[in-house]
């Protein structure tokens, strides 16, 4: 009720659980959800930008759901990420979402808690569905929806947020190129190749990128600490390469499955 007092739909954080805090696969879900639900979604809500729902821990005003009623039920049966699409469709109809961050009387964060995959193959399979559904099928199904009649700045912000949602494939390519460059550079030095002197502009760009990397790791650790304590925050830094590798594996699988779908294979949950 508190969340819906000033918004059309509300979301509480989702906190993934792991059997052991140091779990590399299950733990990376917690790192990503903490950053998303404590940083990104509150910012989107504050900017009145398109805000997806998580499928659990969310509530809606009836009149907001009626605005997007098509007579075929609230969720599309042929969608891989029906919860994500619901939030985007609501935002495009003019509905406003909010991220509700509150603590109970015991001091614990009010959140939806659940276990996530702890094996690499299971994580890649699940995140393939997310990436394909948001970045590829979602583009086909939804296009780039924004609330009609909203100010230009609000529409541009919503389009930017949609791009952020769909940039996973581009991020995977950049990550793969970066890791390949690191491996090749180390191999070249190990084989006795002399270090190259970089142009000042290139050197400055690399230092800037390194600073941004530290900034991103610090933010991830900060928000993971909020959900899992200091130890969880430190582990979030160490697990960043795990997140990156899973993204690269997921991107390849999402592209493969999407191409198969374009050639006629029926859409199905894997």
Task: Label every model-predicted segment.
Residues 34-37, 59-69, 102, 145-152, ...:
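Active-site-adjacent bridging/hinge elements
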Residues 164-260:
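Membrane-embedded multi-pass helical conduit in multi-pass membrane proteins
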